[in-house]
Amino acid sequence: MENLQQIHIDGKEYYIIDSIQNLRAEDSFIYNKNKLAMFDGAGEARKYVGSYIGSNGSRLSDFFAYTRWGDTKIAGKRSYPTIQQGNCFFSKTNLLKYLFDARVEYQQQEQIYHNDISQYYDDYLHTINSLSSDLNFFSIYDVSDFLENKLSRAYIRSDDDIWKIWRKIVLPKISYLSILKLIPIKINNGNTQPLFYFRIFLDYQFRSIVHPQLTQSIIQPSSTESKVAERSYNRRIGADMFRKKVIEHMPQCPFSKISEEKLLIASHIKPYNICIKEGQEDQAIDYLNGLALTPTYDKLFDQGYITFTDKGHLICGTQLSAYTWEKLNINPNAKSKMRIYPEDREPYLDYHRRFVFQDNIDDFV
């Protein structure tokens, strides 16, 4: 158990004993107001979680401790057997973070929807803010294809209000569901019943910190061609100086120990686009706003799978498997102090923890 990743939920500590990641939010599942223009229909309330036959079926059965997938007919009629009773939950914190990440897509819409979804954003935000508890529990039941259906698709559904809420706020194709299976580190009253933590995330390129519309808005339409070219040239010079100073200050990737300059990336802590959008060009080229990392670890940091404390301790998120962490040569429980020279980087690191890191930082610190 000690090798399992740990997480804090509502003041209690849990082991993450298993997870299902990257369950795409299909348009067929989406509440009708948020559906893409290319699709028709009102959407269905059941969520596809994979095939229930073969190795994937065995994994689903083990994960949910449920083996009746598709075997739900009684006297020739569909029944709705419970998979988990009252021990699944969404967190208000995660739902708010999702809406924060999705706000540019809601307001400026890179995808083409049936409706102007910006008109719904404030109502959805109010709905989540009005939830009385951070943890919102619900039950799930089996609405899978019947056994005689060769597609053998496993579906789950809930009739609880929080299920209806997440269907309303989630955006199709660019969102995905993650489910963590948790058991408490300290067992009280012999209760070892697992909890299932449902979370929703947005594809990296559609998050508000890097959204395509954010990038386009940096270049103002009124700018003349010569001004755009001049600004582009100045920023390129600034980027070269930024990289040079970052690597001078931090000449080695703290993960791979590689110091070959050709292989190092000057990775922004507070994203470049955000600095420019806020009119903080000095932050965009401040070497203290950069870490020297080799490409794999740059990707982990840039897309919010890892972050750091103000003292330089590594914090690993919960969206990668134990197998992946092992291959990366990272122990997600170690909280290792990395050589990132954190002094005077605190404001940038704080921004990264709050807005770039994909998990809720309070679940770890």
Where are these regions (language model features)?
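Assembly/interface hotspot detector across virion components, adhesins/toxins, and nucleic-acid enzymes
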Residues: 6, 182-185, 306
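A detector for short metal-coordination/catalytic motifs
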Residues: 231-242, 248-249, 264, 272-365
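Conserved active-site aspartate in kinases
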Residues: 268
